[in-house]
């Protein structure tokens, strides 16, 4: 009898095809389900063995109780419908012990879900620019991996090099979460 398929739910974003291809390239027995507020398919998470929360729009400050920070968001790049949808996904994953990988915005919405806050605009907080370069290419920098973190146990690395394309970041870390890797200016990257 063949092994059952592993079903991974991936939240919709402009680079959904990249995320889906990445997952499908790592196993013949994997299926990807596209999850999105626009599709209104929250019920599809019931068949998912894992979830990838992808990058994308800014997380609205109301979801981390800091409405006073809305002025720092990119107004044309906020989707409260997506925020609400992904928070409902996190309610399900938390209640059902479903693993989650949060990438960029995914990390940020998860931090908000667990009671953390965000830096809404990294450069205005006195940190270096983590967005794309002026020619629209990715920016790269090093990260320091916490030696006591799960990330360090998996990778056995003290330092890494990552691409960086975000202007929001975790600030106060949510309950039960750990900042596993920091950029040289102290921005949470994992």
Predicted regions and their residues:
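Conserved G/P- and acidic residue-centered "switch" motifs that form tight phosphate/ATP-binding loops
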Residues: 104
